[in-house]
Curated annotation (Swiss-Prot):
It is an enzyme of class 2 (transferase). Its EC number is 2.7.1.50. Its cofactor is Mg(2+). This is Hydroxyethylthiazole kinase. InterPro entries: Hyethyz_kinase, Ribokinase-like. The lineage of its organism: Bacteria, Bacillati, Bacillota, Clostridia, Eubacteriales. It catalyses: 5-(2-hydroxyethyl)-4-methylthiazole + ATP = 4-methyl-5-(2-phosphooxyethyl)-thiazole + ADP + H(+). It holds the Pfam family HK. It comes from Desulforamulus reducens (strain ATCC BAA-1160 / DSM 100696 / MI-1).
Length: 266
């Protein structure tokens, strides 16, 4: 009960503090990501111009880098914005969308890992398997792997000195020393474009309002999945789910959150 309350308290802090989340993200998910952030009470900022990197780093609460639709100008902005955020001591989230699918994506991800101090890396099991040096399969930006090596996940988090989240049927979060699991969620999330990308931004919002960044990310995972489960109950398919999911993110109450987290997992 106490642990569930701590997770919920972070969700409430997002409503109170309304963190400003700067997203340098892909063109496919911009609208959905912004709506997810608005639904939970955060403030989304979607940016595409490297010229504003220094100014934005001073005012935002967290920076999210998403390489879903890569192009050279965006890569330049990734590096500039990441360095500016590091200088201002703002947390940086990296979503390595589609890594392992092309050599270009692999090279961009390597550059980001080399030049920017990251606070969180969030990807699906295939993407994190690849980053951790395990043979994982990706098809485009989708994962064909439904498993993650907890040992390698922890080693990767320890090596990079960052929080690492690998999402799938079960989500895993590691800080290098400890690894946590989250079992909330629903299969409909895999059928709506941008749900993974939006989760990366939501995790950034949650981690920005608490000193315990690991607990903040775990709260985001649990809350996001619980909202998905609530939305799925009244949805006929992915189309109705997308709208219901935004409503659930906005309206999920503590009693519902607690019930979902404490329900036995089959």
């Amino acid at each position: 009960m106490q642990e569930v309350q701590r997770l919920w308290d972070i969700r409430q802090e997002v409503r109170i503090k309304k963190p400003l989340v700067c997203n340098i993200t892909n063109t496919v998910v911009t609208n959905f990501t912004a709506n997810v952030l608005l639904a939970v009470g955060a403030s989304p900022l979607m940016s595409e111009g490297w010229q504003e990197a220094d100014d934005l780093a001073k005012i935002v609460d967290v920076l999210v880098l998403n390489m879903g639709t890569l192009h050279p100008r965006q890569v330049e902005y990734f590096i500039k914005a990441g360095k500016s955020a590091n200088q201002e001591q703002k947390p940086v989230v990296f979503d390595p969308v589609g890594i392992g699918a092309t050599s270009y994506r692999n090279a961009v991800a390597a550059e980001i890992l080399d030049k920017i101090k990251l606070d969180l890396i969030r990807g699906n099991h295939g993407e994190i398997n690849f980053l951790a040096g395990i043979t994982g399969q990706t098809k485009g930006v989708d994962s064909l792997s439904n498993q993650i090596s907890v040992k390698h996940l922890a080693e990767f988090a320890n090596t990079t000195r960052t929080l690492v989240v690998s999402t799938g049927e079960v989500d895993y979060l590691s800080d290098g020393a400890k690894t946590f699991t989250n079992k909330t969620g629903h299969a409909y999330l895999q059928l709506v474009t941008g749900t993974g990308c939006a989760l990366s931004s939501l995790a950034g919002a949650f981690m920005s309002v608490t000193e315990d960044k690991c607990l903040g990310v775990l709260s985001a995972l649990a809350f996001y999945g619980a909202a998905a489960q609530k939305a799925a109950l009244i949805s006929q398919g992915p189309g109705t789910f997308a709208g219901n999911f935004l409503d659930a993110l906005y309206g999920l109450e503590f009693d519902e959150f607690k019930k979902i987290l404490e329900a036995p997992k089959i």
